[in-house]
Amino acid sequence: MSRYRGPRLRIIRRLQNLPGLTNKLVESKKNKVSGSDQSIQKKVSQYGIRLEAKQRLRFNYGLTERQLLNYVRIARGAKGSTGQILLQLLEMRLDNILFRLGFVPTIPSARQLINHRHILVNNRIVDVPSFHCKPKDIITIGAPKTYQSILSKRLESFAKDQIPEHLTLSLSEPKKPKGFVNYLINRESIGLKINELLVVEYYSRKA
């Protein structure tokens, strides 16, 4: 299954707000159901609940079905909680790190910068959005000056308290912002509200 490229609002109306996909907030279809319609709503099956959790995870991080399945398999083979390791793997992707640092408004925007070879990790160009960032990595922007000025203005208005503790944003040089990875993210700092166990259960027979 390929990566979704359709209307984003349609997705978040169905799956609720996904910060990585879009910064627009909309009321979900579930909240718009009138009192008379609630009585005739079909009960969602356990499979449906797990499927929705999986879809929320996939669309928020911009993954294909195959990519997400591969991450689940990696998480299953590691020591510790499969669900938490899965979230950690997704959060430590380079495209998500750029998003959490405030360099870009969404993960798709981050992926575009990376694909255009504008991102450096430890002074080396990285053009793979799925690149796994590690503690002590330093992330900088090598984009044209026009984007540098846009970025500096964006970061001026970006609230630093939105940056999770495992990351640090340095603006000592306003036109050359730097992002630092302090340590692997913990569960409390995950950017998406989700029950990861539902995703693990969904893939229990596939991974």
Curated annotation (Swiss-Prot):
GO terms for molecular function: rRNA binding; structural constituent of ribosome. The lineage of its organism: Eukaryota, Viridiplantae, Streptophyta, Embryophyta, Tracheophyta. It comes from Equisetum laevigatum. NCBIfam families: PRK05327.1, rpsD_bact. CDD domains: S4 (cd00165). HAMAP family: Ribosomal_uS4_B. It is found in: Plastid, Chloroplast. It comes from the Eukaryota. One of its GO terms (biological process) is translation. PANTHER family: 30S 40S RIBOSOMAL PROTEIN, SMALL RIBOSOMAL SUBUNIT PROTEIN US4M. This is Small ribosomal subunit protein uS4c. The gene is rps4. Belongs to the universal ribosomal protein uS4 family. Part of the 30S ribosomal subunit. Contacts protein S5. The interaction surface between S4 and S5 is involved in control of translational fidelity. Residues 92-153 form the S4 RNA-binding domain. The keyword Endoplasmic reticulum does not apply. GO terms for cellular component: chloroplast; small ribosomal subunit. One of the primary rRNA binding proteins, it binds directly to 16S rRNA where it nucleates assembly of the body of the 30S subunit. Keywords: Chloroplast, Plastid, Ribonucleoprotein, Ribosomal protein, RNA-binding, rRNA-binding.
